[in-house]
Every structure is written in structure tokens, then in C-alpha cells.
A protein has these predicted regions:
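An acidic/polar, Gly/Ser/Thr-rich interaction patch typically located in mid-to-C-terminal regions
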Residues: 33, 37-65, 211-387
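Short beta-strand-centered interaction patches in the first periplasmic/extracellular domains
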Residues: 2-7, 100-109, 146-221
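Conserved "cap/hinge" positions at secondary-structure junctions
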Residues: 74-76, 189, 342
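Assembly/oligomerization scaffold segments
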Residues: 1-112
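Short, compositionally biased
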Residues: 86-95, 120, 192-194, 351-363
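Extracytoplasmic/secreted envelope proteins and their assembly/folding machinery
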Residues: 86, 128-131, 164-168, 226, ...
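Short acidic/polar beta-strand-loop edge motifs in secreted extracellular
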Residues: 111-133, 144-169, 173, 326-328, ...
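Glycine-rich, acidic and aromatic/proline-enriched surface loops and short helix-turn segments
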Residues: 95-98, 126-143, 298-305
Length: 387
């Protein structure tokens, strides 16, 4: 339930906010003109977005310059406001009649170096070292999940590719999510409910009475039942080929409604250690209808990580759930683990992760809409070699 907000019975909650332009508080300048403020907290490299609509019926609203920095705080009167970060103004609109000014700002300045194409190569390094180097040259502070930072990268090229796209490619290959928030380049494990530093994000409990609308759907997972990735050692002349299959370990308590109809229990086998094959194919899931990754990876480990990352992404999309909270929650962020109650059993029994948060605020109300996906934090894997 919404236990973060406690107030006297019968009292009325009033929305509150503070807006800073560079280092100047301009809240008083816009409070009588504010029509709406929408703040979208996105997962991944899709920048967070701030949209402000101001009434300009008298024509006295000054247009901010592109590149100006807005810092926004939102919440409720009588409670500490929550800082939602810094946003760079990159769009300004004026329309009428009636005359309205729309200011659109994003959490990362994509007119800057993050979006500039670069050439480069990385040799015998780690994922963490690459992220830190890219953060440094973009004047950002890097924060990389420990489980990802130590991943070895024998070689990778960045060819006519922006840092934003290159980091996204690295994240997709290694089961991560990358984003820029409040001056930090975050590289964390997707859907695990932990911060980039490895700390667990406190779980939020939401009851049906907290919201006024919700939507739940189970996706057709029959579209793909598995993922394959190939690897090839170009330095090893031995003509060995190996197939490796990845399957989820059977959990004692698993939500049957979200379980793939072709899922089968697997008996764990301990195979003797053998030299890694020069060439091979790795599969996550079942072989009935397979999504084949087109990239040929340099090592078996890289192929395994890429296939597992893609398979996890497909599995997280097994069900979707969204809810609009009648009472806005400024303290909720993406990647927050959520437990819900008061809905159908299939919804209540599942662990969820927030993938998108949209706050809508004006002078009379404040609501928060959440989009969630299935959380896979407890999933374990085992492999079978098929020589």
C-alpha cells in the first residue's frame, strides 16, 4: 500500500513542486500559469523527459533558450519534495488560440558528445573499464553493476557508432541496461531489482485500492521458444563444433500461468571439463521456434551471454501490467521491484519490476502511472552439451 504517505484523516493532499532554471528558483514565476507538468522516467538509454505546459493568454511568458538546465522537485505539500533530476531544454513550442507555451527537456543532452559518431577498438579489457572510459570522455560519472563490470572483452570495435548506440549494443549482449540519470552513466543488470552498485532496491507494495485503472495481458510466448547464438574461434585451427543448450532450472514454486507450455524439467548433468570447441552454437530455451542472433561471437562465453540476455528479454515480456495510481508517488523509480495485491491471483503471485514511470501534475492533482514487467531475479540456469 502507499505507506510512504501518511496524513491526518480528512485532510486533503495538495500537489507541490519546485522548478529551478539553472540555479534560480522560478516556481513563483510559473505557478499561476502552470497547466500541466508531465515527467517520464524511462528505463535504458531513452532519456527521461520533462514536459511543462504554461498558459500564455497574456503573451508575457518568456521562452527559455535551448540548452538551459531545469531541475525539478515534485511531491505533496507538507512532505519533503523529491528531486527528479536535471533536464536540458531541447524543444520549445508556442501554439494558440488559446496561447500555450510547451517546454520539453530531457535528462541527457543528446545534442552533445554521447550522440557523436566515433571510431575505436577495445582490446583485452573488461566491460567495466569500457563503460568508465566512455563516461569519462562524456564528463559523466560511471556506475557499473559488479556482476557486469568484470566481464572480459577480448576485442570489440566501435565503428562509426555513437557512444549511446555502442553502450546500448554492449548492454544487449551482456544482459544489462544503460541509462544516464543525474550526471551518472548507469550500467546495471536488467530486471534484477538492484542498483548499479549492487544494492537491493526496496520493494514497493501496491494494492488495488491505490489505483483507479489497471491493465494486464499475457503475451503469446509461442512466437519464440528459444534463442541461438554462434561463436567461432578464428585463431584455433581445430575443426571442432559444439552445440550448447541453456534451460531454466525448474523452480519449486513457479507461476503456472506464466510458464511456457513446452517447458520441461531438466535433470542436471555434470559433464567432464573439455577444451572449448573452435566453433559452436548456443541455445537458450526450446528448439521449436528459435530466434537466431545474426552476430557470430568470438568466444563461447560471449555467445552464451548474448543468447541468455536476449532470452531473458523475451521472457520478461511474457506478461505486461500497468496501473495508474490515484495518489502520485514521486519516490518510485524504474527498476523498483513491486508486489501487488487485490487483483487476479495470476497477477498477485508474480514478482514485478517497474519499466516506466509517468508523473502527471498540475495545481489540482498529482497522479503516477506505472508500467511493469515480470521480474526474473531468481532464475537459475543449467547447460547441456550436445556434441
Amino acid at each position: 500500500m502507499l505507506d510512504a504517505l501518511t496524513f491526518d484523516a480528512g485532510s486533503t493532499l495538495t500537489p507541490d513542486y519546485m522548478l529551478m532554471l539553472d540555479s534560480r528558483d522560478i516556481t513563483g514565476n510559473i505557478s499561476d500559469r502552470l497547466m500541466s507538468m508531465t515527467l517520464t522516467d524511462n528505463r535504458g538509454f531513452e532519456a527521461d523527459q520533462l514536459d511543462i505546459e504554461l498558459n500564455d493568454a497574456d503573451g508575457q511568458v518568456g521562452l527559455p533558450v535551448r540548452g538551459a538546465v531545469l531541475t525539478v522537485y515534485i511531491g505533496w505539500k507538507g512532505f519533503a519534495l523529491v528531486c527528479k533530476g536535471k533536464f536540458t531544454v531541447d524543444e520549445v513550442e508556442h501554439r494558440g488560440v488559446p496561447d500555450v507555451v510547451t517546454i520539453r527537456a530531457r535528462s541527457a543532452d543528446f545534442r552533445g558528445t554521447l550522440n557523436s559518431r566515433r571510431e575505436g577498438s577495445w582490446h583485452d579489457t573488461t566491460l567495466g573499464a569500457i563503460v568508465e572510459a566512455i563516461a569519462s570522455r562524456n564528463r559523466l560519472e560511471a556506475s557499473v553493476a559488479p556482476s557486469l563490470a568484470g566481464i572480459k572483452i577480448p576485442h570489440i570495435d566501435q565503428s562509426q557508432e555513437s557512444d549511446a548506440k555502442f553502450l546500448t549494443r554492449l548492454a544487449e549482449r551482456n544482459g544489462g541496461e544503460v541509462s544516464v540519470k543525474m550526471g551518472k552513466l548507469l550500467f546495471l543488470k536488467a530486471g534484477q531489482g538492484v542498483t548499479a552498485s549492487g544494492k537491493k532496491i526496496p520493494q514497493v507494495t501496491i494494492t488495488r485500492s491505490d489505483g483507479d485503472r489497471h491493465h494486464f495481458a499475457i503475451a503469446d510466448r509461442g512466437a519464440y521458444t528459444g534463442v541461438t547464438a554462434k561463436w567461432l574461434h578464428t585463431k584455433d585451427p581445430k575443426p571442432q563444433k559444439q552445440k550448447v543448450k541453456l534451460k531454466r532450472k525448474k523452480k519449486e514454486k513457479h507461476l503456472r500461468a506464466l510458464e511456457h507450455p513446452k517447458a520441461k524439467p531438466v535433470t542436471q548433468k555434470k559433464a567432464p571439463k573439455v577444451p572449448e570447441a573452435r566453433e559452436g552454437e548456443y541455445m537458450a530455451g526450446e528448439a521449436d521456434n528459435v530466434f537466431a542472433l545474426t552476430t557470430v561471437y568470438a568466444t563461447k562465453a560471449q555467445a552464451m551471454r548474448a543468447a541468455q540476455a536476449k532470452w531473458d528479454k523475451l521472457q520478461r515480456g511474457v506478461a505486461e501490467f500497468s496501473i495508474s495510481l490515484a495518489t502520485g508517488r514521486a519516490d518510485i523509480y524504474t527498476e523498483t521491484p513491486v508486489k501487488v495485491s487485490g487483483f487476479k491471483r495470476v497477477i498477485d503471485e508474480q514478482d514485478w519490476t517497474i519499466t516506466k514511470v509517468t508523473h502527471f501534475l498540475n495545481n489540482s492533482g498529482f497522479t503516477t502511472s506505472l508500467e511493469l514487467e515480470v521480474r526474473l531475479s531468481d532464475v537459475e540456469y543449467e547447460t547441456e552439451d550436445d556434441e
